[in-house]
Amino acid sequence: MARVTVEECLEHVENRFELVLVAAKRAHQLSSGDYKPLLDAGKDKPTVVALREIEAGLIDASILSETYEMQEQLSAQQK
């Protein structure tokens, strides 16, 4: 597991507060099982996977603007 730094994650979000919101939402998506990791999760917990995805530029603040309906549609498609 590579170390995830806040500074590297901040290249993809505006500030630390937004980073917390984005990481929390993504970690919740991963832990619910409705979404699959975009990177190899290995034995990492959802929070670490979320931060690694942000650091890699795969997830950004646009995740915060998703509506409930969009989430429901994605969940239905993945099942």
Swiss-Prot record:
Reactions this protein catalyses: RNA(n) + a ribonucleoside 5'-triphosphate = RNA(n+1) + diphosphate
RNA-binding among keywords: no
Top-tier EC class: transferase
Domain of life: Bacteria
EC numbers, comma separated: 2.7.7.6
Cited InterPro entries: DNA-dir_RNA_pol_omega, Pol_omega/Rpo6/RPB6, RPB6/omega-like_sf
TM region positions: none
Keyword terms: DNA-directed RNA polymerase, Nucleotidyltransferase, Transcription, Transferase
GO-annotated cellular components: DNA-directed RNA polymerase complex
Any one GO molecular-function label of the UniProt entry: DNA-directed RNA polymerase activity
Matching SMART domains: RNA_pol_Rpb6 (SM01409)
An annotated GO BP: DNA-templated transcription
Subunit structure: The RNAP catalytic core consists of 2 alpha, 1 beta, 1 beta' and 1 omega subunit. When a sigma factor is associated with the core the holoenzyme is formed, which can initiate transcription.
Function: Promotes RNA polymerase assembly. Latches the N- and C-terminal regions of the beta' subunit thereby facilitating its interaction with the beta and alpha subunits.
PANTHER family in alphabetical order: DNA-DIRECTED RNA POLYMERASE SUBUNIT OMEGA
Family designation: Belongs to the RNA polymerase subunit omega family.
Protein name as annotated: DNA-directed RNA polymerase subunit omega
Protein source organism: Ruthia magnifica subsp. Calyptogena magnifica
